[in-house]
């Protein structure tokens, strides 16, 4: 059986993360929000807090795995994209915000372990 492409594996990881977070009570505002220089995988609402969720999937743990792939450069891109989102979607500008990471590692099959890090980094 052929292995899933990185794109389809990434979409499957985002779908799994979305389903999990909705099960935790978060509400989807938008997904795959793109701007110059970045993309926000999931933008969700947790009560009144806008949550910018970065979904990271890695097949193997090499080079730090899924969590290790969120370096300072990636964090800056996410903060920049979130700032642009709040400028464009000004109805959310006065809400508290946070950055979460959902990390998945291993086979692309359903049921792979998922790690949810709330407030994964400060900006």
UniProtKB/Swiss-Prot annotation:
CDD domains: PoNe_Nuclease. Pfam families: UPF0102 (PF02021). Gene3D superfamilies: 3.40.1350.10. One of its GO terms (molecular function) is nucleic acid binding. Belongs to the UPF0102 family. PANTHER family: UPF0102 PROTEIN YRAN. This is UPF0102 protein PputW619_0932. It comes from Pseudomonas putida (strain W619).
